[in-house]
């Protein structure tokens, strides 16, 4: 499960990797992207063209937003995503790709401590995470969840 990731590439590097123009969209580097943070993402428009947009991490289905106790859903398990009411519609119609430099996975070390491990490509180039998205409730933000596997 991905709970933090790094998005630290320059606008030029992201533009080149995505074959897209990001001019005017500069989010800056983040070495600790956490849920609700804004990051670059790519989606396909109805016309078939790709669009680079700013996405907010954490999908919040309408029925979840009415409860202050429930957190946005940051991950969706690929094995069951099409069966879960929170994700099924987004999985069918609204997919995205999120570029990242790497992500953190925590491993339990000893009795109570957990150690973060940074996972990245050997050549330090961008990696791409599959995601699903929905329009945020009450605003125009595009909320996303990262697809994970077991």
Q: Which residues does each predicted region cover?
A:
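Short linear sequence motif anchored by a di-proline
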Residues: 1-150
């Amino acid at each position: 499960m991905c709970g933090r990731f790094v998005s630290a590439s320059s606008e030029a590097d992201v533009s080149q990797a995505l074959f897209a123009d990001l001019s005017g969209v500069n989010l800056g580097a983040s070495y600790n992207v956490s849920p609700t943070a804004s990051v670059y993402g790519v989606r396909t428009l109805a016309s078939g063209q790709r669009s680079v947009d700013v996405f907010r991490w954490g999908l919040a289905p309408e029925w979840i937003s009415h409860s202050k106790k429930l957190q946005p859903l940051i991950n969706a398990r690929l094995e069951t995503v099409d069966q879960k009411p929170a994700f099924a519609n987004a999985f069918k119609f609204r997919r995205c790709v999120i570029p990242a430099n790497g992500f953190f996975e925590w491993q339990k070390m000893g009795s109570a401590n957990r150690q973060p491990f940074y996972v990245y490509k050997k050549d330090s180039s961008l990696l791409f995470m599959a995601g699903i998205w929905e329009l945020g409730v009450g605003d125009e933000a595009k909320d996303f969840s990262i697809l994970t596997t077991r």
